[in-house]
Amino acid sequence: LVGATGAVLARPGGTRRGFVHALAAITIGAAAMAGPLTLMWRGKQVPPIHDISTDTDNPPPFFAVLPLRAGAANPATHGGPDIAAQQKKAYPQVAPLLLAASPKEAAERARAVAYDMGWTVIAADRDEGRIEATATTPFFGFKDDVVIRVAPAPQGSRVDVRSVSRIGKSDLGTNARRIESFLEKLGGGS
């Protein structure tokens, strides 16, 4: 606002220095506001939830990461039917992945994809088909916990993934995007 006022008041017949400074102020101000405005816009596009699962009827529970979540603002337990309904409406594409691979093979591939995505793997049990990891967001460094469950299915394996933010009422869609990206990478090798 100050930059715009300066640009208007800059003397048309005088030096261009005042006008250039005013334009620089406008540009810097706009750039500074772009990030917060984008976050506000994104927050209005998604429901205020922070727990996303491919299986909303029986979300994979956390065990190994629970000590790391001590003091976290958000619980590790699923929010129940209301959260599941909001998720299904906003992210109908978040669903289990069926792989034509044995559960042990699928679990090993899932662990490799988790590492490739830069997650910190806390626990991985190929025989049990369970992986727990922590993903850290790039810019703010928020910690989100992920659990992967691999179970036998008629044609191979079923992979379910759950991602839960430790803080924040809304994840701004981060957990759904994380799950989709993970499943896309995992399914690419089937």
Predicted regions, residues:
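Contiguous mid-protein beta-loop-alpha structural module that forms a pocket-lining wall or clamp
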Residues: 32
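Serine/threonine-enriched low-complexity regions in disordered or flexible coil/loop segments
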Residues: 21-29
